[in-house]
């Protein structure tokens, strides 16, 4: 617990600072924008690339016998730094943004959702291919007490291939030997299209409500608070899971099959819903089916809570399934 304390103390400080700046703004109508900023930050912790990056780094450091407790925190700080810097810069361009807000909302909203949806579908399909390969290795290893060297190398190759940005920045992970080394990689992840669109949204929200600079600064701080909390919890969860998973080679591959399968489901599910909502809105489609109507009006800010629960349920489910069905393979 002592090893986690500095990171969670920093997270508490971010929450306190964000709330203090928010209340100093003294504008009740600004609270909705602040809540949105916090949820946008929390949402990022469940992105396929965030999960893959933190997971791969923790696995790498754990295998090397090094401290991996701060991976999730430093990654989120790198990503959040982009948001904080760009929000401050955006404050000086508010006049231009106000003038072009109608155009940005019309074009940016549609294009942003389409790009995000297609991006998630591509990620989901790529990870689905990796999942199938992992399942093949798992089936082959049923009769063995341990995985062969070739199988271990193939597993490592597959696991480090998850996530699109993760693939692009893969060479940089060779330089990560301490938790804080992930900070610049998190910064590079923060330069993505979705983060840029969210920065614009935060800046425009501040401008529309005519909040002070102090109030505007509360948004990226709350964004960082939400992201750092869930990224750090993700890291803690992954570290605990790997402590269990690395005790035997079969547990290791079984655990990664469970996590990869869940990542595939989330990416495809969210990607399809985003595309469905854009198409149905632009074509003015009306549905009688209750499920389709629910999907059409689904709020993604609420989805983050469901994903947290889904990850916990999936891990517990896979753990008990292992105990019931596969633990005999270790004997």
Curated annotation (Swiss-Prot):
Subcellular location: Cell inner membrane
Molecular function via GO: high-affinity nickel cation transmembrane transporter activity
Periplasmic side of membrane: 27-33, 88-113, 200-225, 274-302
Transmembrane intervals: 6-26, 34-54, 67-87, 114-135, 179-199, 226-246, 253-273, 303-322
Cytoplasmic side: 1-5, 55-66, 136-178, 247-252, 323-331
Xref: InterPro entries: Ni/Co_transpt (IPR004688), Ni/Co_transpt_high_affinity (IPR011541)
GO biological process: nickel cation import across plasma membrane
Family annotation (Pfam families): NicO
Keywords linked to the UniProt accession: Cell inner membrane, Cell membrane, Membrane, Nickel, Transmembrane, Transmembrane helix, Transport
GO cellular component, one term: plasma membrane
Bilayer topology term: Multi-pass membrane protein
Matches recorded under PANTHER family: HIGH-AFFINITY NICKEL TRANSPORT PROTEIN NIC1
Protein purpose: High-affinity nickel intake protein. Imports nickel ions in an energy-dependent fashion. Necessary for the expression of catalytically active urease.
NCBIfam families with a match to the protein in the record: nico (TIGR00802)
Family: Belongs to the NiCoT transporter (TC 2.A.52) family.
Protein name from the UniProt record: High-affinity nickel-transport protein NixA
Species: Helicobacter pylori (strain ATCC 700392 / 26695) (Campylobacter pylori)
């Amino acid at each position: 617990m002592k090893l986690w304390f500095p990171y969670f103390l920093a997270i508490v400080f971010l929450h306190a600072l964000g709330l203090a700046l928010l209340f100093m703004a003294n504008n009740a109508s600004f609270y909705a924008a602040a809540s949105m900023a916090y949820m946008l930050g929390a949402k990022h912790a469940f992105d396929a690339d965030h999960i893959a990056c933190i997971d791969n780094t923790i696995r790498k450091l754990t295998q090397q016998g090094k401290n991996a407790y701060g991976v999730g925190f430093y990654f989120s700080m790198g990503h959040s730094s982009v948001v904080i810097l760009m929000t401050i810069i955006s404050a000086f361009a508010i006049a231009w943004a106000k003038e072009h807000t109608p155009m940005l909302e019309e074009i940016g909203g549609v294009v942003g959702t389409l790009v995000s949806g297609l991006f998630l579908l591509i990620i989901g399909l790529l990870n689905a291919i990796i999942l199938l390969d992992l399942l093949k290795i798992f089936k082959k290893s049923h009769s063995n007490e341990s995985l062969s060297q070739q199988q271990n190398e193939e597993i490592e190759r597959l696991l480090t291939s998850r996530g699109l940005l993760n693939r692009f920045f893969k060479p940089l992970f060779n330089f990560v030997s301490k938790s804080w080394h992930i900070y610049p990689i998190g910064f590079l992840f923060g330069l993505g299209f979705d983060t840029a669109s969210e920065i614009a949204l935060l800046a425009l929200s501040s401008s529309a409500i005519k909040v002070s600079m102090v109030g505007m600064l509360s948004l990226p701080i709350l964004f960082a608070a939400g992201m750092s909390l869930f990224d750090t919890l993700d890291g803690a969860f992954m570290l605990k899971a790997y402590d269990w998973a690395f005790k035997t080679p079969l547990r290791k591959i079984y655990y990664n099959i469970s996590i990869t399968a869940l990542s595939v489901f989330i990416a495809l599910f969210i990607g399809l819903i985003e595309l469905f909502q854009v198409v149905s809105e632009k074509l003015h489609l009306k549905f009688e089916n209750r499920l389709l109507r629910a999907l059409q009006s689904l709020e993604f800010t609420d989805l983050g809570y469901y994903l947290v629960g889904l990850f916990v349920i999936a891990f517990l489910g896979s753990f008990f399934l292992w105990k019931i069905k596969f633990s005999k393979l270790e004997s």
